[in-house]
C-alpha cells in the first residue's frame, strides 16, 4: 500500500474527527456509502484501463 501525502493525512484526521460526532447508525450508513463510492471508482478505473489505447 502506498503512503499518504501530508495533505491526505490532514484530510484523514479531519475525517476521523467528524466521524466521532456521528452516532453508530449514522457511521454504519456512512461506511456503506463510502464503500459503494470506492467500488464505483474501481469500476471507472477498470473501464478506463480496458478502453485505453496505448
Swiss-Prot record:
Gene3D superfamilies: Phycobilisome degradation protein NblA. It is found in: Plastid, Chloroplast. The keyword Plastid applies. It holds the Pfam family NblA. It comes from the Eukaryota. Belongs to the ycf18/nblA family. This is Uncharacterized protein ycf18.
